[in-house]
A protein has these predicted regions:
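Ferredoxin-type iron-sulfur electron-transfer modules in oxidoreductases and energy-metabolism complexes
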Residues: 35-54, 101-251
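Short strand-turn-strand beta-turns centered on an Asx-Gly dipeptide
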Residues: 12, 29, 74-76
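Short, structured protein-protein interaction patches enriched in aromatics and acidic/basic residues
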Residues: 57-69
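Short structural boundary motif marking the start of a folded domain
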Residues: 3-9
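Short, contiguous acidic and Ser/Thr-rich linear segments
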Residues: 23-36
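Glycine-rich phosphate/adenylate-binding loop and adjacent beta-alpha elements
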Residues: 74-98, 103
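Short polar catalytic/cofactor-binding loops
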Residues: 11-17
């Protein structure tokens, strides 16, 4: 059984997107090591409510590393110190007794703060609406199994489809670029026969929307790849660049 640890929680508090924020320091005593990070925040919030104080606002849903909503910057890393894991998959045992744990929201022009640790990630939805889908008729459900796709290609498309749209890539990037997200969504479709028909339009539309929403440009620092909880490869960015250049040459 994991031992209990005590630490200092330094949490960003901000009442709204236009308000000035500040850090609140909260001492946490004897937290069991097998408590998940979000469970710890639940416990802290319960104590704050009992004292008549405002609870910490943070986003969450599945708590299984699938939805991407638990987007927190922990000790300078998106989703915390673990590799290939989301915030909800982080446990208190990863920290040491006496540590100061700093928790912040995503810092990106494309993700305005709603309150405290919750940001508006609707920009990613708008990018998806610009072209992250297949709209042409690809036949019925059984027809997909009738189209031969090489196993390596199918695996590569599946790897790209692992992206959960959490926003860690844009938050980690010094330019606030969403290229890893866009490239993963373009790749998962561009690699498959069903997605090739609209490949040119998709690449141009999704990149245009990304630029419109205030995300920066990629300068290949690879911070996105290092911090991605699903280990999405930046080789997808190279593919997106090829798709975009090919599409522009056809204009």
């Amino acid at each position: 059984m994991d031992k209990n640890i005590s630490f200092t929680l330094k949490v960003w508090r901000q009442r709204g997107p236009k308000e000035k924020g500040h850090f609140q320091t909260i001492p946490v005593k004897d937290m069991p090591g097998d408590t998940s990070f979000l469970e710890m925040l639940d416990i802290v919030n319960e104590e704050l409510i009992n004292k008549g104080e405002e609870p910490i606002v943070f986003d969450h849903d599945c708590r299984e590393g699938i939805c991407g909503m638990c987007s927190l910057y922990i000790n300078g890393h998106p989703h915390g110190p673990a590799t290939g894991a989301t915030t909800c998959q982080i446990y208190i045992r990863r920290f040491n007794d006496g540590d100061t744990i700093t928790v912040e929201p995503w810092r990106s022009a494309g993700f305005p703060v709603i309150r405290d640790l919750m940001v508006d990630r609707g920009a990613y939805d708008k990018i998806m609406q610009a072209g992250g889908y297949v709209s042409v008729n690809t036949g019925g459900i059984p027809d997909a199994n009738a189209i031969p796709i090489p196993k390596p290609v199918a695996d590569e498309a599946m790897d790209a489809a692992a992206c959960i749209g959490c926003g860690a890539c844009a938050a980690a990037c010094k330019n606030g670029s969403a290229m890893l997200f866009v490239s993963a969504k373009v790749s998962q479709l561009a690699l498959l026969p069903q997605g090739k028909v609209e490949a040119a339009r998709r690449a141009k539309a999704m990149l245009a929307k990304m630029d419109e929403l205030g995300f920066g440009n990629c300068t290949n620092t690879r911070a996105c790849e290092a911090e991605c909880p699903k280990c999405i490869s930046i080789s997808n960015i190279a593919r997106l660049n090829r798709e975009f250049i090919s599409a522009k040459l056809k204009d």
